Amino acid sequence: MQVKETVADGLKREFEVNVPAADIDAQVDARLVDLKDKVKLNGFRPGKVPVSHLKRVYGRSVAAETIDKLVRETNDGIFAERGFRLATEPKITMPQDQKVVEDILAGKSDLNYTVAIEVVPTIELADFKSFSVEKPVVEVSDSDVDDAIKRIAEANRAYADKAEGAKAESGDRVTISFKGSIEGVPFDGGTGEDIPVVIGSNSFIPGFEDQLIGIAVGETRTIKVTFPTNYASETLAGKPAEFETTATKVEAPQDTTIDDEFAKTLGMESLDKLKEAAKARLAAEYAGATRLRVKRQLLDRLDETHKFDAPPSLVEQEFAVMWQSINAEMQQNGKSFADEDTTEEAAREEYRKIADRRVRLGLVLSEIGEKNKIQVTDDEVSRAVIERARQMPGREKEVWDFYRSNAEALAQLRAPIYEDKVVDFILELATVTEKPVTREELYKDDDDKTAA
């Protein structure tokens, strides 16, 4: 066998490979000998079929199988000998001329093929002990807890029927039945019976709730609205519609007394227990935001200290996924690049930079994990699946079966766990300094940086 490197351009490599016909023929014969005791042919006793006869009957198919195996093993040897880690699957170019192919299968000609690859660059890892990270810390204050309790009370406030003939005001809850039409023609999903809506909640089409102000029980109104251009249904988006709407109930919001009795309506023993639960939830929320801030700093530091050319094919794949998502989102929201004060060309350039960063950081994190034997256990993956299942009550078995039968989905679930474990490993080595901040500072937008 002969191997000749013909391309060595950056991370791209290409090889011309020659496999002698004699090598192929020898492996075909070995395979036929192995099959001799397993094949049953009329006129021959088990195990007594001559190899020459087997070759006439099965030679072509066995040769094809052998060549496929030889190519895979040869390629693996080429890559292993040179210490290559592949960024993508190798591109193999086999002979296309039918006569040449037949001669190769018949053992009359050598096999000549080319294999092109893109390799992962050698990554020199930084000294993580030199990293410094600032950890923003927010203490959950009594006022934070009180505000959270007020929001809970607002979301769970009671309503009571208004006096007979009373008209609806902003903040009231009106129960309505309606029939919608466009140019006099009813449309799918345009009817509703006894639907409660709080005026001012902005839960209906823009302009709909405002036209309920002043309506009384038993009154019917024609409400005219225009569906937003970014409405989920393309058949309705941007179109004017009319809704014949009848109010069946008008209720006013009641003041909520925040006390033990209110807490009990939420399943808590007392107001103190409700406050404890609210404080714990806020603490978890702040901890999550803190984690994101710390991780952002760490990824930025990894980006700064690991500059190398990322495999172009991986960058292109990442960019393609991002670009498809961006375009779908813009189309759904009815926006253009001009609306975002940019051009398509500028946006492409910016997102290609982001794609390059993501690929490089992914390779760096993978290298760190590999060199430090960081692994995701089956138990950790199982816990992640269970958590996903909990988010879909009543469909737990469906979620479990989906991940059990979908290796790609399971890999997507495993990836962020692996990334977090690598991040935790680096944080153990880095210098982490806590900095007290306000809630507003913790959640302040950081538009000048892009997370991986």
From Swiss-Prot:
Enzyme class: isomerase
SUPFAM superfamilies, alphabetized: FKBP-like, Triger factor/SurA peptide-binding domain-like, Trigger factor ribosome-binding domain
Enzyme Commission no: 5.2.1.8
Disulfide bonds: none
Primary residence: cytoplasm
Listed Pfam families: FKBP_C, Trigger_C, Trigger_N
Subcellular location: Cytoplasm
GO MF annotations in UniProt: peptidyl-prolyl cis-trans isomerase activity; protein folding chaperone; ribosome binding
GO biological process: 'de novo' cotranslational protein folding; cell division; chaperone-mediated protein folding; protein transport; protein unfolding
Domain (PPIase FKBP-type) ranges: 171-256
Cellular component aspect of the GO annotation: cytoplasm
HAMAP family: Trigger_factor_Tig (MF_00303)
Protein name: Trigger factor
